[in-house]
Swiss-Prot record:
Residues 5-34 are annotated as: 3 X 6 AA repeats of R-R-R-R-S-S. Probably phosphorylated in infected cells. Residues 1-65 are annotated as: Disordered. Keywords: DNA-binding, Late protein, Phosphoprotein, Repeat, Viral nucleoprotein, Virion. GO terms for molecular function: DNA binding. It comes from the Viruses. Residues 18-51 have a biased composition (Basic residues). This is DNA-binding protein. GO terms for cellular component: viral nucleocapsid. It comes from Bombyx mori nuclear polyhedrosis virus (BmNPV).
Length: 65
């Protein structure tokens, strides 16, 4: 029983850590890319990309529901 509980906790911690690390990496990469694109003076590209991502995510969520 103790072993099972310990194993479950370890799995949860590993999953949480992995998920958090992946999210952080994605944000950092995206932010860096955004900074590079925004620096040249092209906010239109970033805005379009963000809008497209948001629309796609919204569509997926609607479809799921």
């Amino acid at each position: 029983m103790v072993y099972r509980r310990r194993r479950r906790s370890s799995t949860g911690a590993t999953y949480g850590l992995t998920r958090r690390r992946r999210s952080s990496a994605g944000i950092t990469r995206r932010r860096r890319s955004s900074g590079y694109r925004r620096r040249p003076g092209r906010p239109r590209t970033y805005r379009r990309s963000r809008s497209r991502s948001l629309t796609s995510r919204r569509s997926y969520r609607t479809r799921y529901y």
